[in-house]
Every structure is written in C-alpha cells, then in structure tokens.
C-alpha cells in the first residue's frame, strides 16, 4: 500500500499541470502535459531500474558485463525496429505517392491522408515489437561477434564446427525475422489497397479483364512484385541455410545427414535455389513491366514452379527414395553415417576418452579385505540426504525460523584421512516468524541472516541410531580444526529470498542465547550503500516506497542487500550458462562458500544426438563460487579447451577467471557434477557401441539401472558419490558413479541385471576422467532392482519390517549403493530406518549387505559385514559414537534442556490463554523438539 501511495505522490508532480489546464478547459494542453507526465513516469521507472541494477553489478565488480549486454540489447532493439519500419514506411509512401490524384481532389486527399496516418501509427507498435524481439536474441549476436574456431570440420560441407555453434543460430534469427517482416509487409500492402478500394469505390462492377487494365491494379501488382523481390531474397537465404540443417536431420536411423539427405534432399535444395534465383529475376522484371496481366502470369508460373519443387522435390521424392531404396538396404547404406553420428555424439558429450576396464565380478565375498577396502568401507554412505534432513530438522532446528534447505555431500581431509561428510546450512526463513513478528523492521533490519552449519559423517551414528555430528549447535561446535567456522553468518543462501538493510541504527539478531539473543552488525562490503537521495529514490521505486523515507533507522553507512538467493544471483550475472540442479556449500579457511557447476550448451552440433530437451553439446566449463557472507560471485573456467566458454570470455574478459586462480582450499572441494554424469550416462548407454552394425541392431544397448521406490514403482538410480580406489591409482579418491543394466523395450518386464558401472573422478589432476567397469556377459551380475527385491523377500527382514509397521512406526529405506572392492568383488549396501508416525525423526535400525547370492543383515553396518569378514568386527567402534561427554556434562546439558522446555511450555500456556492458537501451535512444536533432544 505504501508503494502505491509513493507512486501516486510522484505521479501528482507530473500530472498537476495537466489537471490545471483541464480545469481551465484547455484540453489540448492538458493532453500534452498528461502525455509528458506518462513519459516522465515511464522514464523514472526505467532510470531507477537501470541505475539500481548498475549499482548492484558495480558492487560485484561486473559493471562492464552489465553495460555491454545493455548496450548490445539497445543496438539490437534499434536495428530491429529500424529495419521493420523502414520496410513499412517504404510501402506506405510508395502507396501514398501513387494514390495521389492527378488534379485537385480535397475529399480524396483527406481520405488518403487518413489511411496514411493509420499506416504510420501502425509503425509504432511494429517498431517496439520488432525491437523487443531482436533485443531478446542478444546472446546469439554476442556469440556471433565473438566466435572462436573449434578446430574440427563437419564431414559434409567441411565447415568448422564453430560455424554451426556461433554463426548459424544468429543467421537463422535474422532470416526468420526477415521472413516475418515480409509477411507483415504483404499484409500492410493488402490493407492499404483494400482501404483505398473501400474509401474510393475503385472495384465495384469491374470484371477481371477490366480490372487488370486499371491504374489501381497496375500499382497493386507492381508494389507486390517489389515485395516479392525482397521475400524471394529471404527465401533464397532460408533455403541456403536449410542445406546446413540437414546435419540435424531426424530421417531414418541416423541423427544427422543420412544417405537420403545427401543423395536426394541436398540436390533438391540446390535445384530449389536455382529456381528461386530465376523467380527473383522474374519478379524484378515484373516490378518494371507495364503489363498487369503479364505480371499476374509471372506470379502464377512462379507459384507453380516453386510449389512443384517444394512438394515433389523436397517432400515426395526423398520419402520415396527413403522408403524404397534406403530402408530395404539400411545397414550398408547408412553405416558411414552411423559412424559419423557415433563419433560426433561422443565428441559433443565429452565421451571420447572413457577408459574401459574389464571387471570380472567375483560373486564370493571370501578373502581378506585390503587396506584400501577398509578405507572404502569406512566411507560408505549410510545416511540418505532426505532422511538426514528429517533428522536435522528435529535435532538441530534450534528455532522455528531456521531452515535446512537441503543436504550436501562432499569430502574433507580430517586428521589426514579422506572423509565423506553430509552438510546442511542453517538458513533463516522469515516466513516462519510468528505473525505478530512479521513487521517491516523485523523482516528487513533485524532478522537478516542464517547462522552456522551442521555436518555429519556419512556412516557414523549414535547408539540410538542418530547421526554423530562433527559440526552442530549455535554457535557451531566443530569436532575437527579443519571444520572450524570463523564466519558462520549466512547473508546469501539457497532460500534467502528477501532484501534486507544492514548497518542501520538497529542491531541485527544473530542467534538465540539463553534468555536473550546475541546481536550483530554486518561488516561486509556487499550491497548498495544508501548514501544519497538519488540512491534512496531508486531503491524506494523498486522496494519499500515511502517507508524508506519515513524510517529513522537508516544512516549514510546503511546498505541494502538484495538478490540474495544464490540461484537468482548467479543466473542474473550469467544467464547464458546452464546450471546444475544441485549447488553445494563447503567450509574453507573458516568461511562458508557455495559452489555451483555451470555448463555451456548448444543445440546445433552436427551429427550429435540431442538430449536434455534439445541440447546436443555440453561442457562443464565453469565452477561458480559464492561467499555466503560477502555475496561475491566468482566464475572460474574449469575447461579452457571449450570454444564456447572461450567465446564468452572474449566477450566478458573481466567476468571469468582462470581455474588456477581458485584458492587451493576451494579446489579441494571441486566435484564432478551429478547432472553431467547423468546426461553422459544416458548417451553412453547407447553410444558405447562403436561398431555401426552393433549400434544399428542395438545388440548391446544399456540403460541406467533402476531401483524400487514403492511397491510397484521403480525409477533410474541417481548418480552417487563414493570414496574408492581405482585400478590405476595408488590412493583412495572421491568419485561419482552410476550403474548400467541392459536396455529393455518392455518397461513392465525390464532386464534388471547389471552390465557396467561408470566412474567420474573428482580429485586433483585426474579430475574429469571417466572410467567404465565392464562386467562379464557370460554370467549373472545382480542389478540394484534385483537386490532390492531380494531384500524385501528375505524372510527375516520381511518379519522385522512387518513387526515395525504393526507397532505404528514407518519403515524407510535408504539409498541402495553398489560398491566395487578389491578382488573384483561387488558389494551392495542398503540401510533401513524407522520413524514414529508422530515426530518424524528417522533412526537407523538395520543395514543389509549383499555379495552375489549371499545376504547379511545386522543392527549396524559392521555387524552385517562381519558375517562375511570376521576381522571387520574389530573396527565396529569406528562407526559408533564414542562417549564425548562426562556424566557431569550430560547432567548439566540435561538441566539446561529442562529449563528451556519449562520456558517453552510456559510460553505455550500464555499463548493459549490469549487465544493465539496459531502461535501456540508453533510453541508446542518447539517444545516437542526440545523433548526429543532430551530422549
């Protein structure tokens, strides 16, 4: 409402003169000032948006990136608008001059001027629409003008791949725009002459022969001929470009130009080009001939010629050849083109150097575990992200207004040991504040940031089946110096959506501290400083209106932080990049950072099979790092060989940094992206078949293995991280993996055995390298879905599950993981949790371990594993929490919890007494959490 009053108050400044003239019945002046007022308001809105956005970019150090795109969009807007109205004005003035009578005719003159004014008025929306559409294609223009070569040529036209990635999309946009303008031009000409016919009664009673002899008809066909010259030129360009688009043909079994495309479709396009060139000359001739009938004859002949070529040459003949010549001889004719499809698809998805290793699975768990196996086993993830989040929500929430957006998986070197951790940030969610606390000051000046982190090892838990935390509570307590957090405040996060003002006269809420709250003042440099009236006006226009001028809490040192959620913040700066679905945060040198994988993609890589909707080229070329306190955004180029990112770096030299400039503490946390491996695996499941004959018959086609998620529902496994030791390595490393099963056309009866596993390496110099474990084809290797079925059908496990469900608890299954070990052994692990129907806090109750045909089941991972390897029992204590507190410490902690619970209960009673039932319900939820901690 205050924003509305602010808008009205500014509007009055501009509209008061108009109101004064309106009162004096000076309507023309009143209208003039009203238009000036509207233009001024629009100008102020545009100015405030551009000015405030430029200040935001300047604070991040990317002002040059903002201005470059803004000016490029303005240039495209003007270019598109000018071209559009140039064509329109040419047609209008040609008509107006030819329609003027030879002698004086005031009535005809006035009507012609009326038509002229209407036509001219239409040019304004045409200019705006054409300019807006053109400016929206700034990314294609940017790449076109900053193109770099790929150093590879397509096999048909021998053009560098860069032409298809950088030039072809922009050329397509230009040709499509001109085609639309040609259509509009014809409609405009038709409208002008129809209006003339209606106003001046040109046509009534005229037979066709008589009509063709009139000056009106001659002017009409002459102007249409001139437009056809323009349109035919555009169609020549369109047909010429269509030749290159054969490299994305879907005809037949090949994606890309196949036998029919190159032996029938391409020659037909060449014939069409010759025919269009002939028609262009005919239309040029028709523009100057004095015979209307001859011109109409040219139209009909050209239409028949082009229609015949289009229908017969471009549609019917290629389909006949495909059906009768190619389909009966498909494999021998299409094999060379299948080879191209395989080769270029692998190149486009970065799959040319996958190291394939035979892994003759040993179904027996017998033998001694190597030291590397023990390291792998001690790092296997038992906590599922969604289940750990549910536990965190119960044990580490602290207050209702905190929120854990998700759980991230990463590795840390703790005491010299590579350890896989699961981490959750405690962000602030103002929507969870009590209704009476949702005030302007609370939402924008006091509750400004989240606080701290929660971290737990992936496989350690207490005797109660809860996680053993390495970082917990507020302020955060870290069990290892490598996990210390010197700056735990989170001003920029995954779910930090609102704007805030910092460095105000009010102290910010920091974290709850006993009966009071700790307070804080922001000391960073993020945001826009509110040190002038002009800045305050621009901020008020976008955000808080009059409140910004009436509040007494702002000082010249105050700052506004906006666009604080990482997703929008990063995408605003680099909208031309594609981003992974999952960003993750890391702790490095005592600070919290977000890391986000960004991709360069394209849809026009020749002969490459599309996926991800339309894209058929992808590179993980950029690692984005965002400081959770300062809000800084850094773009590190992780694949400098990618021509697409080199083009963007050429356009924005100050935006991208070399990967070597990334601090080592952050490099240690770079991961291979989950989305990228999922996409590559989807492609490699088919394109690992390099032989055209095998590929054609799909003899060895795979798909990503599936796992049961409900009673009769299965879905593909998502990539998961492991600590593993690969054959060519002398140490354990962090890898991302995904299993494959044979492809099945019948989804109701899939082939569920496992045929391979792909590993993506995440560490050091081996980052990004892919390794494939190929399993034997001559014997059964159980897949995840089969293992899941066996677990559910095991008699002992089934009885326990039934008993737990009957006791009112809900059984939840964790992620089913396949883990390769030494001696070509393949181990499956699945944890089982139970949670009460009230409280929703899962606890680990059983772990299932499977080797081949043998299944083991225990109350802990070690217990289940020790049935295969008795020596593992000695290390069971490693994954059980050791008592970390003395009895006195536990007693003191329990005393604090009792006091806190009593206070929460008293708060609940007070709220109930006041009739504030919603707030009382929230107070009761908080009491429940405290009581859960006391268990």
Model-identified regions with their sequence ranges:
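Cytoplasmic-side transmembrane-helix entry/capping segments in multi-pass membrane proteins
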Residues: 28-35, 301
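N-terminal membrane topogenic signal
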Residues: 1-4, 26-30
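Soluble extracytoplasmic regions of secretory-pathway and membrane proteins
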Residues: 15, 20-21, 39-914, 918-934
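Hydrophobic transmembrane alpha-helical segments in integral membrane proteins
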Residues: 1-14
């Amino acid at each position: 409402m205050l924003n509305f009053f602010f808008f009205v108050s500014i509007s009055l400044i501009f509209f008061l003169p108009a109101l004064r003239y309106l009162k004096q019945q000076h309507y023309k002046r009143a209208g003039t000032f009203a238009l000036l007022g509207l233009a001024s308001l629009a100008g102020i809105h545009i100015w405030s948006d551009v000015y405030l956005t430029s200040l935001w970019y300047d604070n991040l150090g990317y002002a040059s990136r903002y201005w470059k795109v803004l000016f490029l969009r303005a240039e495209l807007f003007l270019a598109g608008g000018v071209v559009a109205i140039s064509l329109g004005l040419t047609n209008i003035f040609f008509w107006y001059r030819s329609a003027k009578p030879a002698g004086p005719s005031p009535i005809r003159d006035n009507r012609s001027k009326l038509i002229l004014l209407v036509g001219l008025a239409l040019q304004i929306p045409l200019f705006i629409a054409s300019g807006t559409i053109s400016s929206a294609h700034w990314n294609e223009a940017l790449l076109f003008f900053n193109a770099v070569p790929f150093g590879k040529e397509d096999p048909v036209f021998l053009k560098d791949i860069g032409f298809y990635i950088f030039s072809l999309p922009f050329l397509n946009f230009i040709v499509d725009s001109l085609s639309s303008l040609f259509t509009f031009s014809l409609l405009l000409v038709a409208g002008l002459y129809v209006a003339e016919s209606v106003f001046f009664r040109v046509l009534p009673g005229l037979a066709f022969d008589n009509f063709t002899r009139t000056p009106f008809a001659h002017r009409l066909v002459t102007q249409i001929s001139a437009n056809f010259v323009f349109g035919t030129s555009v169609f020549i360009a369109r047909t010429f470009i269509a030749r290159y688009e054969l490299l994305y043909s879907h005809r037949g079994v090949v994606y890309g130009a196949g036998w029919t495309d190159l032996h029938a479709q391409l020659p037909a396009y060449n014939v069409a080009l010759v025919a269009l060139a002939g028609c262009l000359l005919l239309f040029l001739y028709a523009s100057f001939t004095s015979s209307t009938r001859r011109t109409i004859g040219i139209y009909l002949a050209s239409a028949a010629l082009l229609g015949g070529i289009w229908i017969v040459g471009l549609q019917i003949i290629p389909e006949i050849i495909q059906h009768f010549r190619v389909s009966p001889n498909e494999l021998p004719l299409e094999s060379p083109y299948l080879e191209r499809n395989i080769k270029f698809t692998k190149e486009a998805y970065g799959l040319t150097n996958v190291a394939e290793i035979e892994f003759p699975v040993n179904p027996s768990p017998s033998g001694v575990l190597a030291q590397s196996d023990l390291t792998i086993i001690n790092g296997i993830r038992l906590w599922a992200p969604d289940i750990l989040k549910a536990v965190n929500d119960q044990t580490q929430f602290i207050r209702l207004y905190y929120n854990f957006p998700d759980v991230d998986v990463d590795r840390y070197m703790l005491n010299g040991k590579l350890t896989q951790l699961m981490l959750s940030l405690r962000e602030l969610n103002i929507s969870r504040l009590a209704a009476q606390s949702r005030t302007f000051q609370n939402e924008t000046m006091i509750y400004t940031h989240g606080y701290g982190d929660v971290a737990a090892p992936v496989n350690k838990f207490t005797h109660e089946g809860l996680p053993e935390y390495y970082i917990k509570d507020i302020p955060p307590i870290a069990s290892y110096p490598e996990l210390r957090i010197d700056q735990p405040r989170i001003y920029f996060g995954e779910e930090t959506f609102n704007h805030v003002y910092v460095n105000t006269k009010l102290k910010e809420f920091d974290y709850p501290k006993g009966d009071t709250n700790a307070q804080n003042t922001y000391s960073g440099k993020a945001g826009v400083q509110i040190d002038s009236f002009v800045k305050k006006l621009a901020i008020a226009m976008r955000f808080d209106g009059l409140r910004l001028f009436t509040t007494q809490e702002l000082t010249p040192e105050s700052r506004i932080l906006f666009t604080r959620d990482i997703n929008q913040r990063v995408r605003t700066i680099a909208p031309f990049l594609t981003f992974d679905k999952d960003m993750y945060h890391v702790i490095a040198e005592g600070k919290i950072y977000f890391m986000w994988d960004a991709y360069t993609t394209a849809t026009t890589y020749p002969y490459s099979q599309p996926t991800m909707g339309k894209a058929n080229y992808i590179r993980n070329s950029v690692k984005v790092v965002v400081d959770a306190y300062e809000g800084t955004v850094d773009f590190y180029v992780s694949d400098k060989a990618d021509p697409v990112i080199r083009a963007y770096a050429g356009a924005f030299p100050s935006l991208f940094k070399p990967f070597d400039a990334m601090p080592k503490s952050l490099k240690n946390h770079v991961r291979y992206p989950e989305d990228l491996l999922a996409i590559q695996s989807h492609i490699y499941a088919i394109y690992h078949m390099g032989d055209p004959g095998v590929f054609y018959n799909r003899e060895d086609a795979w798909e990503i293995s599936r796992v049961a998620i409900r009673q009769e529902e299965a879905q593909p496994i998502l990539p998961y991280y492991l600590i593993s030791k690969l054959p060519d390595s002398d140490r354990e490393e962090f890898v991302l993996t995904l299993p494959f099963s044979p492809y099945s056309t019948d989804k109701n009866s899939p082939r569920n055995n496992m045929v391979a596993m792909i590993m993506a390496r995440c560490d050091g110099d081996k980052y990004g390298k892919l390794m494939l474990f190929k399993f034997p084809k001559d014997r059964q290797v159980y897949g995840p879905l089969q293992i899941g079925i066996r677990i559910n059908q095991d008699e002992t496990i089934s009885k326990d599950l039934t008993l737990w469900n009957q006791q009112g608890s809900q059984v939840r299954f964790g992620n089913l993981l396949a883990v390769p070990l030494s001696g070509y052994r393949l181990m499956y692990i699945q944890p089982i949790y139970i949670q009460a129907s009230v409280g929703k806090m899962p606890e680990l109750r059983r772990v299932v371990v499977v080797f081949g045909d043998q299944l083991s089941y225990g109350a802990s991972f070690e217990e289940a594993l020790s049935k295969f390897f008795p020596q593992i029992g000695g290390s069971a204590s490693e994954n059980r929490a050791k008592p970390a507190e003395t009895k006195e410490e536990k007693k003191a902690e329990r005393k604090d919890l009792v006091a806190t619970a009593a206070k929460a209960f008293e708060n609940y009673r007070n709220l109930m007494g006041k009739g504030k039932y919603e707030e009382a319900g929230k107070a009761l939820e908080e009491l429940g959490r405290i009581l859960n901690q006391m268990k």
